[in-house]
């Protein structure tokens, strides 16, 4: 919202996009502005391709694209071809999330290339900073062993089971009791 507000202060026309419908919906909810899928933004018309391209570029001053780690090389190529020279492009994403299903790891490659300005955010807002899931994810990224200890008031659980049936029983117990209690959510609302 801060980036959007800054551009709006200069009267710039902002486009918002994301690779999936779910991500676009979250972006709309978070910003109060309409976000579209990249395919919809580019006016995909299979099998011909995209209506928005070099000859018929996007209209606007700024394009902000969220969840960029999910964008493969083919879709990013189509997107970049549709951006006119004057348009500013802001790519938002987490390179530590799963990469795109299609070919390429575009966001990571762009960040590693050093050809564009990169800003890394280090403060976590989605979950409490006391989250052991987040803490252990950071430890793993730093090449450290995660804290595998268990407790009653934690969002991180580690268990080892050799027998597949015991593993299934432990997962069921985890969902029905531990996670349900920790998140104060019915087990029917927890996805595994």
Predicted regions and their residues:
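Conserved helicase motor core of P-loop NTPases
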Residues: 95-192
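Short glycine-/polar-rich loops that comprise or flank the Walker A/P-loop
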Residues: 11-12, 60, 85-88, 114-119, ...
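Inter-Walker segment of RecA-like/P-loop motor cores
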Residues: 13-62
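Walker B catalytic acidic pair
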Residues: 66-67, 93
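Conserved RecA-like ASCE P-loop NTPase motor core of nucleic-acid helicases/translocases
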Residues: 1-29, 35, 90-92, 155-167, ...
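Catalytic P-loop NTPase motifs of RecA-like helicase/translocase cores
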Residues: 42, 71-72, 98-99
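Short basic/glycine-enriched coil/helix segment immediately N-terminal to the Walker B
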Residues: 47-61, 72, 80-87, 187
């Amino acid at each position: 919202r801060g980036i959007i507000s800054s551009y709006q202060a200069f009267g710039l026309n902002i486009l918002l996009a994301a690779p999936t419908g779910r991500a676009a919906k979250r972006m709309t909810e978070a910003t109060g502005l309409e976000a579209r899928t990249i395919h919809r933004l580019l006016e995909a018309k299979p099998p011909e391709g995209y209506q928005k391209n070099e000859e018929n570029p996007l209209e606007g001053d700024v394009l902000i694209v969220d969840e960029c780690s999910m964008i493969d090389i083919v879709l990013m190529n189509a997107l970049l071809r549709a951006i006119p020279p004057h348009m500013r492009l802001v790519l938002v994403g987490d390179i530590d999330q799963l990469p795109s299903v299609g070919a390429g790891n575009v966001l990571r490659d762009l960040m590693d290339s050093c050809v564009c300005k990169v800003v890394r955010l280090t403060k976590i807002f989605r979950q409490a900073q006391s989250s052991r899931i987040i803490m252990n994810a950071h430890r793993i990224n730093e090449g450290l062993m995660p804290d595998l200890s268990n407790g009653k008031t934690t969002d991180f659980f580690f268990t080892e089971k050799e027998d597949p049936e015991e593993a299934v029983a432990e997962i069921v117990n985890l969902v029905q009791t531990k996670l349900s209690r920790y998140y104060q959510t019915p087990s029917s609302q927890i996805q595994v």
